[in-house]
């Protein structure tokens, strides 16, 4: 419970690694590397590194999406009862359109509109998303029944993207579109600590969790329509000409 829960691959202290490659429909290519090991022979300092990248297109024309994730984790085992773990995650993404809308002047599932019809425009600037996350964990085993856990997190998010939207549609399937842009930034700070354990009263076992959460969330967003109507001929859903 609490403000946030994050599940990331943690160091195990065992030296191992893996490489994964995938491919699929619509020019999907995905690769991932997972490295797990120790920096000191005593296993006091251990690490985990995950890197993944993806490049793909869509069933609609022109649309595409590229992603990159880098997630290093470092754990310092102070002693057999105490550990500190630091994590960082970077997520980067670029895409032409986050979604695709199809409009028809006739009916739902209009057979005259191609399945790969793209509502946006290949001449648009791709949207870019950058997300940084940092975590710090402290764990202490107090005795055989009780544990103390503390964690802090910092999130930093930026997104800049453009999009097109329908103004109206004619009976012939032409739709003048307007052009808009979005510039977003988010910054979140979280803290949490808890005691977790159990006690008995006679034959009854009590499992106890007590803690405190702190959160501070900030978001800035600027959304505007740059052009009330995109210059040039309106896009026609039956014969789309882009540019």
Show the residue positions of the predicted features.
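Outer-membrane beta-barrel transmembrane domain signature of Gram-negative proteins
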Residues: 9-34, 203, 212-243
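Internal hydrophobic scaffold segments of catalytic domains
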Residues: 80-96, 198-231
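Solvent-exposed loop/turn elements at secondary-structure boundaries
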Residues: 105-114, 182-188, 192-194, 198, ...
């Amino acid at each position: 419970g609490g403000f946030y829960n994050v599940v990331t691959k943690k160091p195990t202290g065992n030296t191992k690694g893996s490489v994964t490659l995938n491919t699929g429909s619509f020019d999907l290519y995905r690769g991932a590397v997972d490295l797990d090991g120790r920096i000191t022979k005593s296993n006091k300092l251990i690490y985990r590194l995950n890197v993944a990248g993806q490049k793909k297109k869509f069933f609609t024309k022109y649309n595409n999406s590229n992603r990159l994730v880098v997630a290093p984790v470092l754990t310092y085992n102070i002693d057999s009862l105490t550990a500190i773990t630091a994590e960082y995650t970077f997520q980067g993404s670029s895409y032409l359109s986050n979604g695709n809308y199809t409009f028809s002047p006739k009916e739902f599932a209009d057979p005259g509109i191609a399945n790969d019809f793209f509502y946006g425009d290949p001449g648009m600037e791709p949207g870019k998303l950058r997300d940084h996350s940092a975590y710090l964990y402290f764990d202490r085993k107090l005795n055989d029944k009780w544990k103390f856990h503390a964690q802090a997190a910092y999130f930093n998010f930026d997104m800049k993207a453009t999009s097109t939207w329908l103004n109206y549609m004619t009976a012939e399937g032409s739709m003048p579109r307007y052009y808009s842009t979005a510039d977003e930034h988010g910054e979140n700070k979280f803290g949490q600590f808890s005691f977790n354990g159990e006690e008995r009263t006679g034959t009854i076992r009590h499992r106890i969790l007590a803690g405190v959460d702190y959160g501070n969330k900030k978001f800035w967003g600027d959304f505007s329509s740059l052009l009330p109507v995109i210059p040039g001929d309106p896009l026609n859903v039956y014969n789309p000409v882009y540019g």
